[in-house]
UniProtKB/Swiss-Prot annotation:
InterPro entries noted in UniProt: Bifunctional_P450_P450_red, CysJ-like_FAD-binding, Cyt_P450, Cyt_P450_CS, Cyt_P450_E_grp-I, Cyt_P450_sf, FAD-bd_FR_type, Flavodoxin/NO_synth
Residues given in the record as FMN binding sites: 512-516, 560-563, 591-623
Domain Flavodoxin-like: 506-648
Alphabetical keyword list: Electron transport, FAD, Flavoprotein, FMN, Heme, Iron, Metal-binding, Monooxygenase, Multifunctional enzyme, NADP, Oxidoreductase, Transport
Protein family membership: In the N-terminal section; belongs to the cytochrome P450 family.
The protein's annotated pathway: Mycotoxin biosynthesis
Function: Bifunctional cytochrome P450/NADPH--P450 reductase; part of the gene cluster that mediates the biosynthesis of the host-selective toxins (HSTs) AAL-toxins, sphinganine-analog mycotoxins responsible for Alternaria stem canker on tomato by the tomato pathotype. ALT1 also selectively transfers methyl groups at the first and the third cycle of chain elongation for AAL toxin.
Protein encoded by which gene: ALT2
Binding site for heme: 412
Segments passing through the bilayer: none
Annotated protein name in UniProt: Bifunctional cytochrome P450/NADPH--P450 reductase ALT2
PROSITE patterns, per the entry: CYTOCHROME_P450, FAD_FR, FLAVODOXIN_LIKE
EC number: 1.14.14.1, 1.6.2.4
Organism for this UniProt entry: Alternaria alternata (Alternaria rot fungus)
A Gene Ontology term for the protein's cellular component: cytosol
Length: 1103
């Protein structure tokens, strides 16, 4: 390939970068000549390539890249494939120009959402998805190749969806070969964007028109999918501090405006696309290098074993895995998911000391080359050697030697999220598996907008010879996320002590873009009060310009952003620079700085500057400056508390500003001034036997498109015992959306105190009488806002319609009677509250409204676990009932649409997250619905949907019982149980076939034979052509009769219709068998059933 001479020097004497000549068709420029590897290795530090209609300058040198990362001369250009992605993700943070007001506003709103505290709080959701992947691998066994890129894409897509918008794609529950449509569309649009960026528009529009049509169609599909998520959240709001809620509700701190819906869509798509593809690439290449470098793999595993052992990985573990972080850094150095980025000059400029570039000229920095600079990384720069990325060596890297997360203000704000997810994923994989390399694999690269290895597979073997079930148990052993709680007993005698006898106060000042400093300010305020200090004020830095307090010590907590102050500290720093010597005398101060080592050149620059300016101009430093590196080996909160304990508080104590306060290295010994007694909430105290359990996990078990099935894991109160087959009563709460609707309707504040008196106390059981209670708590926890309105309720409401609205009264009266009531109210679960919202002309008092409601009653759910499965814990399996469908209220209401109500309890359960409390009480099963663990009695279990719950508990207990017996007998396997069948009906194998892996393990152990029926996919394997479970029973009639004659017990769990259909099949069969065996003389099946022995045919019917 020939290279032209540099162009003639400009008037300033500097040539443009040399341009690669086309070797084939000049009108196509270098399109047919592009070979990324050859370009980066053979054409020098700076050159230019021609795409026919435009040219790009290419830079491969670290030194020149350092120039281009100077944001006073150059800014990011969303060029190339990124520019083409605007059709998909609009003006998101990835694609919009920095000076675009939409980018600036979105950045101000979104950047604080990625502070360390929020990211740390996402750990449970990240672990949830990672556990799904690991359990899937364990159940595949060591003989099945794992397609690494596919698995990592599932992991990262599901994680970012769950953490940011509380949505589950459930990718790991899809059959192999059936890709999540969203993920498939993402890969397609990214691939086509890259192709488009390398071709002239006339080729894209005229030659590639079919590809462009597909690209545009999939872009619309992706945007529509995000729009649906947003609409769903608005219709079904959740009290969750996630990215979606924040983007919909937070205001731009400068303009006071919220983000438009279009910008919310743009940025959510940006996170989904840019976030999951890049992290998937990082994890895929990390697996490749670990497989290629056994010594690195062994060292990384040893670190995980020493730090975590076999316990559940917690947030505090991640900062104690420095070698694993070095492995990921080295992976990013060699295989940056995004091979570079574009910048443009802010004005005509000269780069590399000699090349002229015009204003707005697109310049591409190839970081694949910059990251392999031998002057920085040595002659072995192309080799994978994590030791070169140890913290000590990493801190010594020259500027711009490592930029996988971009530069400056346009650096990736999701970096902490990606690194936490990546460290967690690799640590969990190494903790639980031995990795088996495919010796025949040779690295091949696939380039879209990111880079990933093609065809990479490995096999995995659970470590230490564990079986898949053992891996599952190990993942959920004592984790520290929750501990068994004592049963509440009115008052537990606990004391909270706070002293306020210190005469001094603190002024706390914070400044950061991400909100981290603000969180630390709140922590300091709490700790200061605990130690006897008052807090005079908590302010942002810009608010104390020329107002630095002199009467109290000032603690300033701040961060740097590429060497510059945060937005809310810029004025403060500017003012400090203008102060003169002695001007700040009398000010006593301490500074704490936050930063991240990946920006080593500007680490703690602003905190150091503030500390220096204060001291130089007369202020007194009361404690040495503290710092915390959020990329370091400890977490920021520990660093901060260590600093306050060792330096700040001891100084204050020595100056007698914390009188009568004992420090004792942060010990919790304090003078008693305030006594706080803890007791049960009134709604719990009114019901005997209820105590608090703690949620440890809440996971979805079904795919989109069917009513959601979920499993809730609870840490039970201490002393709580149950049997497999028992039920758990729970106290639900109304949705925050319904509570807010009531408050708005009656013009109440959430904190308004309401007192209820009644002359007929016995009619108001369940309501708090004669005691003040906050309105928000009354409507959340005491009355059922979603209960279907009775015909009488509607008649009462009709009588309260304003006299000048006769039409509304007629509508209500028509709804209260006959078929209209059944079809338009009862079937659609329309509540009194729904009617008040729909018809504001109903004039009802608060007392009248309460009189129409029923107290909230407990709901019962079957345990889906056995008591010995995980002592102290239990699971419930439930269906989220019927929320979300739009229904027409009635013809006579002019087809006004109303949302069908979901079930109160199931909707409430679906909102719970780890560490939430739930009040529970034991509800024993019928004596006939227990498995007596008889080894000689056959069992026939029949279930539909979540009716499978008690049978999972039965099988768990049987498995553990066999294992215990084998242990006592000194053999590997105990004798088998009698034949056990499970007939299970659901919609389809890829939709809601619950506990597939668990049941497969039970079958492999010889504990059960599973027979399925799929109502939406009766041709699927395993259904024997049956849509419903009664059909499957009829197909097995002969063997069922044989088992009945052997004394089999039958257990049925499901809805009333299903149970009736089951008996319609089995009743005549078993009745006839008993007649033939002369065990009954009854000719009537119904009468025969009443003569059966206890537990011979037992039913649990859903109500």
């Amino acid at each position: 390939m020939a290279i032209s001479s540099p162009s003639q020097a400009r008037s300033v004497g500097n040539p443009s970068p040399r341009c690669v000549k086309s070797s084939t068709y000049p009108f196509l420029g270098n399109i047919l000549d592009i070979d990324p590897d050859n370009f980066t290795k053979s054409l020098g530090d700076v050159y230019m390539i021609n795409y026919g209609s435009y040219r790009d300058v290419i830079v491969t040198s670290r030194k020149v890249a350092q120039e281009l990362c100077d944001e006073s001369r150059f800014c990011k250009l969303p060029g190339g494939a990124i520019d083409r992605m605007k059709r998909v993700i609009g003006n998101g943070l990835f694609t919009a120009e920095t000076r675009d007001p939409r980018w600036q506003s979105a950045h101000r709103v979104i950047a604080p959402l990625f502070n360390p505290m929020r990211i740390r709080g996402m750990m449970d959701d990240m672990r949830d998805v990672c556990e799904q992947m690991c359990l899937r691998w364990a159940r595949f066994g060591p003989g099945v190749p794992i397609k690494i890129c596919d698995e990592m894409t599932k992991l990262t897509l599901d994680t970012i969806a769950l953490c940011t918008v509380d949505h589950r794609f459930n990718s790991f529950y899809r059959p192999d070969g059936i890709e999540e449509p969203f993920a498939e569309a993402v890969v397609n649009v990214m691939t086509d964007s890259l192709i488009q960026s390398n071709l002239p528009d006339w080729i894209n529009n005229w030659v590639r028109f079919r590809s462009m049509n597909k690209f545009n169609r999939q872009a619309d599909e992706l945007r529509h999918a995000i729009e649906e998520l947003i609409e769903s959240r608005r219709k079904n709001p959740v009290d969750r501090n996630d990215l979606l809620n924040a983007m919909l509700s937070h205001e731009d701190p400068e303009t006071g405006q919220r983000l438009s819906d279009e910008l919310v869509v743009d940025n959510l798509l940006t996170f989904f696309i840019a976030g999951h593809e890049t992290t998937s690439s990082l994890l895929s290449f990390c697996m490749y290098y670990l497989l290629e470098c056994p010594d690195v793999l062994q060292k990384a595993r040893a670190e995980v074993h020493a730090t975590v052992g076999t316990s559940t990985i917690m947030p505090e573990h991640l900062s104690k895995l420095p070698y694993l972080e070095s492995v990921l850094r080295e992976t990013l150095r060699l295989r940056d998911p995004g091979p570079g980025f574009f910048v443009k000059p802010l004005r005509d400029d000269v780069i590399a000391g000699k090349y002229f570039v015009k204003k707005d000229q697109s310049i591409f920095i190839v970081f694949d080359s910059v990251h392999r600079d031998p002057d920085v990384y040595g002659d072995d720069a192309d080799e994978f050697r994590p030791e070169r990325m140890s913290q000590e060596k990493f801190d010594q890297l020259p500027p711009c030697a490592y930029k996988p997360f971009g530069n400056g203000v346009r650096a990736c704000i999701g970096r902490p999220f990606a690194m936490q997810q990546a460290i967690l994923a690799v640590a969990m994989i190494l903790q639980h598996f031995d990795l088996i390399k495919d010796e025949s694999y040779k690295l091949k690269i696939h380039v879209t907008m990111t880079v990933r290895p093609i065809g990479l597979t490995m096999k995995v073997r659970p470590r230490e010879g564990l079986r898949a079930t053992d891996v599952n148990l190990r993942m959920h052993q004592a984790s520290g996320t929750a501990t068994p709680k004592p049963l509440a007993s009115g008052t537990d005698g606990s004391m909270l002590t706070v002293t306020k006898n210190g005469p001094m106060h603190l002024a706390i000042v914070h400044a950061s873009n991400s909100g981290t400093s603000e969180a630390l300010a709140g922590l300091l305020a709490s700790n200061a009060v605990d130690r006897g200090l008052g807090v005079k004020s908590i302010s942002v830095a810009n608010d104390i310009v020329e107002k630095l307090p002199r009467d109290v010590p000032v603690v300033i907590i701040t961060a740097s952003y590429n060497g510059e102050p945060s937005r809310n500290a810029a004025d403060f720093v500017s003012w400090l620079k203008s102060t003169k010597q002695h001007e700040l005398e009398g000010v006593r101060y301490a500074v704490f700085g936050c930063g991240h080592r990946d920006w080593a050149s500007s680490l703690f620059a602003v905190p150091k500057l503030i500390d220096s300016l204060l001291s130089t101009n007369g202020a007194e430093q009361i404690a040495q400056m503290g710092t915390s590196d959020t990329g370091g080996s400890t977490d920021i909160y520990s660093d901060f508390e260590d600093w306050t304990t060792k330096f700040l508080f001891p100084y204050l104590n020595s100056k007698q500003e914390m009188k009568d306060t004992k420090l004792n290295s942060g010990a919790d010994t304090r003078d008693v001034d305030l006594h706080v007694s803890l007791g049960k909430p009134p709604r719990v105290a009114m019901r005997k036997g209820f105590a608090a359990a703690t949620v440890t996990k809440n996971r979805s078990l079904s795919a989109p498109g069917v009513p959601e099935k979920c499993e809730l894991e609870l840490c039970l109160p201490d002393g709580f015992t149950y049997k497999a087959g028992d039920h758990l009563q729970i106290l639900p709460r109304n949705s925050s959306n319904d509570v807010q609707s009531v408050l708005r309707h009656f013009h109440l504040e959430a904190e308004t105190l309401v007192s209820i008196q009644s002359a007929h106390r016995n009619k108001r059981l369940g309501l708090p009488l004669d005691v003040p209670i906050m309105a928000s708590e009354l409507f959340a926890a005491y009355v059922e806002l979603g209960r279907t309105a009775s015909s009488r309720n509607i008649h009462v409401l009709a009588g309260l319609v304003r006299s000048d609205k006769p039409k509304i009264k007629r509508i209500l009266l028509s709804l209260a009677n006959g078929e209209s009531y059944k079809t338009e109210v009862l079937d659609k679960r329309i509540s009194v509250l729904d009617l008040l919202k729909q018809f504001p002309d109903i004039e009802i008092s608060l007392a009248g409204f309460l009189s129409l409601l029923m107290p909230i009653r407990p709901r019962s759910y079957s345990f889906s676990s056995g008591p010995n499965w995980k002592p102290g814990f239990a699971t419930l399996t439930y269906t989220v009932v019927g929320a979300g469908k739009l229904v027409s209220k009635a013809k006579m209401t002019e087809h006004v649409a109303m949302s069908m109500r979901g079930g109160l309890a199931s909707t409430f359960l679906s909102t719970l997250s780890a560490r939430d409390d739930l009040y529970v009480s034991l509800d024993p099963a019928s004596p006939s619905f227990y498995d007596d663990q008889s080894v000689s009695c056959p069992i026939i279990m029949i279930a539909a949907g979540t009716g499978i719950a008690p049978f999972i508990g039965f099988l768990q207990e049987r498995k553990l019982s066999l294992a215990h017996t084998a242990l006592l007998q000194g053999s590997k396997k105990a004798g088998p149980y009698a034949r056990t069948l499970l007939f299970f009906g659901c919609r389809g194998p890829a939709l809601d076939s619950l506990y597939t892996e668990e049941l497969a393990a039970f079958e492999a152990d010889g504990l059960v034979e599973v027979r399925r029926a799929f109502s939406r996919d009766h041709t699927a394997a395993g259904s024997n052509g049956c849509k419903y479970v009664d059909q499957r029973l009829a197909a097995s009639a002969e063997e069922l009769v044989e088992l009945w004659r052997l004394g089999a017990r039958v257990f049925v769990c499901g809805g009333k219709k299903m149970a009736n259909n089951v008996f319609d099949v089995l009743g005549p069969l078993f009745h006839e068998a008993d007649k033939l065996d002369q065990k009954t003389a009854e000719d009537d099946v119904g009468k025969w059933r009443t003569t059966l022995g206890k537990g011979r045919y037992a039913e649990e019917i859903f109500i």
